[in-house]
Regions:
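Cys-dependent protein tyrosine phosphatase-like superfamily
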Residues: 1-115, 127-192
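Ser/Thr-glycine-rich phosphate-binding loops at phosphate-binding pockets of nucleotides
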Residues: 120, 124-125
Length: 192
């Protein structure tokens, strides 16, 4: 399948040969042809995981198109830049509160294909993806491999971000297998 969006870095289906769940960074520039492509592939439920402030700063043009059901489901618990590598998996675990569980249920039970995203499509989107893949019965290796695609997709962006924000450590914000493996070890004991 062709790219869904020209101006995103991390848009992709999480299940092979299926458009059921599409993860992304925020699509802020969406052409009419891209909207038509989404609708043609029945990707009509849009779940925005960003905070109200993030949405106001960078609104998605999918919000105002009647062909799409646009759901604002902010993930705000654990929504901070981790200071150390040890904080990352704890941050991911903290995200899984009642609101996120309801969001997962919404995504899982909707009748259409779903596009979901946060700002960079890395942490909040990564946690949602991991849970959806876990519920789909995918292996730990598959889930970690999906998560690690984000490292290559966002490498240049994250390097630039770390240069522009000297207090942010690149080795912490860059996805590492360990972060997802620790989260998945916790997730295996949950009933989600």
């Amino acid at each position: 399948m062709e790219r869904l969006f020209e101006h995103t870095l991390n848009t992709r289906p999480i299940l092979e040969n299926s458009l059921r769940f599409i993860r992304s960074d925020v699509p802020t520039q969406v052409s009419a042809a891209e909207k038509d492509r989404l609708a043609a592939h029945n990707i009509t439920t849009i779940v925005d995981l960003r905070s109200a402030a993030e949405c106001a700063k960078a609104p998605s043009p999918l919000m105002d198109d009647a062909r799409f059901t646009y759901l604002c489901r902010p993930v705000t618990v654990g929504n901070a830049v981790p200071e150390t590598a040890d904080d990352v998996s704890r941050l991911y675990i903290a995200m899984v509160d009642g609101a996120l569980r309801r969001t997962i249920d919404t995504i899982w039970n909707t009748k259409t294909n779903v596009l979901y995203f946060c700002s960079a499509g890395k942490d909040r989107t990564g946690v949602v993806s991991a849970i959806l893949l876990h519920k789909s019965g995918m292996s730990l290796e598959y889930i970690v491999a999906d998560y690690m695609k984000t490292a290559s997709n966002l490498k240049a962006f994250l390097e630039s971000y770390a240069r522009e924000h000297p207090g942010i450590r690149l080795d912490v914000i860059m996805p590492h297998e360990r972060y997802m493996e620790e989260f998945l070890a916790w997730l295996a004991a949950q009933k989600i």
